[in-house]
Amino acid sequence: MMEIREMLVDPSKYGIKCPSKMTPKYITFHNTANDAPAENEIRYMIGNNNEVSFHVAVDDKEVVQGIPFDRNAWHCGDGNGTGNRQSIGVEICYSKSGGSRYYKAEDNAAIVIAQLMKQFCIPIENVVPHQHWSGKYCPHRMLDEGRIPSFIERIKQAYEGEEDMNRTLQLEDWQWKQLFDNMGKAWNAGKFSDWNWMVKIENRCLTVDELAWLNNHILASSL
């Protein structure tokens, strides 16, 4: 797992950089087409006054976030389409001539994308390159080297390679329904207050670890 360091845009610039609330349903990956590190990419993006924006930048050492995940960003070139309105933008650094640093940034990006998939219940089918939305030749280096399929495969491996406690529950349809009904009763009884837990159950992406924590929380609230 990679820590995502926040360096968020000032709310006074929301109208320019991220004007709309968003529930992420896709993840879009890009190449930066330069050789700056993640912090520099984010610092420049949040500091200027043009509309171009993205959520995170990933380099060989870290992941830096500039736009909140619950707000849209202008990174897909599809106007008010699904890419700009419903996808998290991930910029992969050092793609111009970064050598081994670039490939390490790619590895890190696969890990963080897998994390975001799990966090927001996004299926692998909804993880796409920038080119998917507007036809732009991006991520340029992956396209040049014909490696988008292998990058998607690395994301799958990162997603599936987590420890058992971080794996999504494997339940039958009736079991998911029963879990939703039972947790709904606990929520109505005030045993927990965050409805996002119910959303995760409804979307069938609750992990073993999360269920254990939730059960312990409900038990403790009954003492």
Feature roles, as predicted:
Residues 1-83:
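N-terminal catalytic cores of peptidoglycan-degrading enzymes
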Residues 1-21, 25, 93-166:
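Basic/polar, cationic surfaces and motifs that engage anionic cell-wall
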Residues 19-21, 48, 82, 97-108, ...:
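Extracytoplasmic/periplasmic, Sec-exported soluble proteins
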Residues 35, 44-48, 69, 112-120, ...:
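Structured segments of extracytoplasmic/periplasmic soluble domains
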Residues 81-91:
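Short coil-to-beta-strand
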Residues 163-223:
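Short, solvent-exposed alpha-helical surface patches in non-cytosolic proteins
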